[in-house]
Regions:
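Surface-exposed acidic/polar loop and edge beta-strand patches at domain peripheries
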Residues: 1-85, 89-265
Length: 265
């Protein structure tokens, strides 16, 4: 299983309910805050159906926020399409972003690309760090073209970072497999967390590969949709837990994530 399984991690909300993390994949609405982002979803779904190659699931609306999480998973020969929906079932418009979180197994190494845009006199990339992240943390490694974050099961202290991911992919290597998540970046739209459409959270129990939609005002009875595409490749691994840039480039070319040598000039 490329995904983490965490049955112990849980948060107790002010009303006494418990939000279990569980691992795997989950849907949230962003920006993150407590307790709104941690409402328990450990209850039966409102509805589900199978339509051809697609599974469609609607959770029960959250009583406090009146937001309803929706999921449509479509199996395709080349990949899996995962559509994340946030529906406003309340009476007023709400601004938020859809947030897809894939919690990958302990020992995973996550790789994502920097920007290769030639913006002349203007900056072309940024990295965003959360307050509990130590910049010198050895689990993070930064190159010109790619960035690497490694999950160390012996390191419990968390870290989190994000970026404006213009390449639209992130990869997690674990168990001689590579899980790839594809997602969009809409240049003219505003994103949460200092303009992040990609984020990763790392702790001892696993590492998260997260994509975010643009911020959107969701009117009553309207659904905000955000799409991810997933691939899993078997029989592939990194040469070391913290590989060098040239090694990464060769592997990513093999996976079809890098088409040219633009990053390693």
């Amino acid at each position: 299983n490329v995904f983490a399984e965490d049955v112990q991690e849980a948060d107790v909300l002010p009303d006494g309910s418990v939000c279990h993390v569980y691992g795997g994949f989950r849907i949230c609405h962003c920006p993150e805050t407590f307790p709104r982002s941690y409402i328990s979803d450990s209850h039966p779904v409102e509805s589900y159906s199978v339509l051809g190659d697609s599974l469609v699931v609607d959770a029960q609306p959250e009583v406090w926020t009146q937001m309803q999480k929706r999921l449509r998973v479509t199996l395709r020969p080349e990949d899996v399409e995962v559509q994340i929906g946030i529906k406003n079932t309340g009476a007023w418009a709400v601004q938020c972003a859809a947030w897809g979180i894939s919690a990958c197994a302990p020992g995973s190494t996550v790789v994502f690309a920097g920007s290769s845009e030639d913006t002349g006199y203007l900056p072309n990339r940024s990295l965003v760090f959360w307050p509990y992240t130590k910049i010198q943390d050895a689990r993070m490694q930064f190159f010109n073209a790619y960035h690497v974050v490694r999950c160390d099961p012996a390191r419990a202290e968390p870290l989190k970072l994000g970026c404006r991911n213009t390449q639209g992919w992130a990869a997690a290597f674990v168990h001689q497999q590579c899980y790839i998540k594809h997602f969009a970046r809409e240049a003219a739209r505003e994103y949460p967390d200092f303009d992040c459409n990609f984020e990763t959270y790392d702790a001892d129990w696993g590492i998260e590969v997260e994509s975010l939609s643009p911020l959107q005002m969701i009117e009553p009875n309207q659904t905000l949709w955000h799409t991810e595409r997933w691939e899993i490749h078997s029989g592939i691994s990194l040469p070391t837990a913290m590989p060098q840039e040239a090694e990464l480039h060769q592997i990513l070319q093999h996976l079809g994530l890098v088409e040219t040598d633009q990053f390693c000039k």
